[in-house]
Amino acid sequence: AVITDSNSGITQKQAERYGVVVVPMPFLIAGETYFEDVTLTHDAFFARLQEDVDISTSQPSPETVMEIWDKALETSEEIVYIPMSSGLSGSCQTAIMLADDYDGKVQVVNNQRISVTQKQSVLDALTLADRGWSAKQIKEKLEEEKLESSIYIMLDTLKYLKKGGRITPAVAALGTALRLKPVLQIQGEKLDAFTVAKTSKRGISKMLDAMQDDIEKRFGGIENVHMEVAHTCN
């Protein structure tokens, strides 16, 4: 069985089509807990975000993860579990500790992925499983290639970087006053500032330049690259 979490961007409906299981990530909104794409739709989440209510994320409880694993093992001999990057959440390390009690039947992949790159790892795992690879072999292959990806993100506001403690209030205030669009980068386990732009058009241009540089210098040409686009409410 291949299992991931909702940070992959795989919806519950897509999971049924792919034949995988998606662990929903919990959100705490105004003191109440919701589960992504189960008790909280994406549209509803972004609507609440616009209301300026307090929103924080959490990792799935150990009980939830183990319950999903146990159910999967009723029909599968082993599991490949692909959580979000260990550099962005403690959920991966928690899963690694939980897997110690499963005698090798659960292989937790720590390949520093999230969003579209995490989704691609799930699809790659399915392909390898269809070829007869064991869960351990799949884990090793995915981790071997963990640095062979890049994500570039442009945000419309600095507000949530400030709330998450990734930038200081002073920097956020200056950036907001200048109407700057932050461009972030994920390579490996960390989310880092890449550049800023004064307009969305300029931000997109800078991302495209960075992607072109990656394609030519890191990945050896477009024929070696798989690209995806992710967006929210636009």
Where do the PLM segments sit?
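Generic signature of intrinsically disordered, low-complexity segments enriched in small/polar residues
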Residues: 37, 48-49, 72, 105, ...
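N-terminal glycine-rich anion-binding loop in soluble enzyme alpha/beta folds
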Residues: 1-59, 64
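A generic structural signal for short
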Residues: 34, 57, 83-84, 159-161
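Mixed-charge interfacial surface used for oligomerization/domain docking
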Residues: 7-21, 26, 78, 87-107, ...
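Glycine-rich phosphate- or other oxyanion-binding loops that anchor nucleotides, phosphorylated ligands
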Residues: 51-87, 93-94, 139, 146
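A short glycine/small-residue-enriched secondary-structure motif
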Residues: 40-46, 69, 96-101
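Long, low-complexity, intrinsically disordered polar/charged segments
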Residues: 1-2, 73, 227
